[in-house]
Design a protein with these regions (language model features):
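Short amphipathic alpha-helical patches
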Residues: 10-17, 68-69, 164-168
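Solvent-exposed, flexible loop/coil residues
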Residues: 59, 74, 82, 96, ...
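Acidic/charged, solvent-exposed loop-and-adjacent secondary-structure segments enriched in E/D, K/R, S/T
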Residues: 49-70
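Hydrophobic transmembrane alpha-helix bundles
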Residues: 31-44, 75, 166-177
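N-terminal mature ectodomain segment of secretory-pathway/periplasmic proteins
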Residues: 1-53, 79-131
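Non-transmembrane domains of secretory- and envelope-associated proteins
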Residues: 2-9, 97, 106-109, 118-178
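Short glycine- and basic-residue-enriched patches
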Residues: 27, 63-79
């Protein structure tokens, strides 16, 4: 489970993620507010809105999400925009974590604190910080099972089960980390 907070509002989601060779499958169900399930197979993303009987089809941009933003392959290295400081160790959702802080080099960017699981590097918690270091929003796992058995076939079947839904192709808007 992931719990996130922005502007004092809390939301929670349940996430499944599995890798089979070079295929990644993921499902994210919102547990707060309007029901929504998002299923991803590599870069193909489908979001099911059961109340509206709509499913949107989208293509995810490679390199546009964490942790790829920290990779020089994503464009300019993160060090061009941030000073990176190791803050030590902590625990999130029962897992030992390394904590780093990204301090912006200019006034146009937010700062970040990131907790990553020691063994896998999986991001367990993030905080977005203002110029004074105050937390603007945060997201963290509240429960996590690494190496838990996930039925990849069930995730694949959900992507194929669009009967009774109106299919909408999402419009693409290219973004950059800068």
């Amino acid at each position: 489970f992931v719990v996130s907070s922005a502007s004092g509002a809390l939301s929670s989601s349940r996430i499944w993620h599995v890798c089979e060779g070079d295929v990644q499958l993921e499902r994210v169900d919102t547990l707060t507010g309007t029901p929504r399930s998002t299923v991803r197979r590599n870069d193909t993303v489908m979001t099911f809105l059961p109340d509206a009987r709509v499913v949107t089809l989208d293509q995810r941009q490679q390199g546009a999400v964490f942790p790829n933003l920290l990779s020089p392959a994503a464009g300019q290295p993160v060090a061009d925009f941030y000073d990176v400081r190791e803050l030590g160790r902590g625990r999130v959702a029962g897992c030992d974590a390394d904590i780093v802080q990204l301090l912006p080099r200019d006034a146009w960017r937010f700062g970040y604190r990131i907790w990553s699981e020691n063994r896998t590097g999986l991001v367990l918690k993030t905080q977005t910080l203002d110029a004074q270091g105050r937390v603007l929003e945060q997201a963290a796992f509240s429960e996590l099972q690494l190496d838990a058995p996930v039925q990849a076939e069930q995730l694949r079947q959900m992507m194929a089960s669009t009967q009774g839904y109106r299919l909408v192709q999402a419009e693409q808007a290219r973004t950059t980390p800068q």
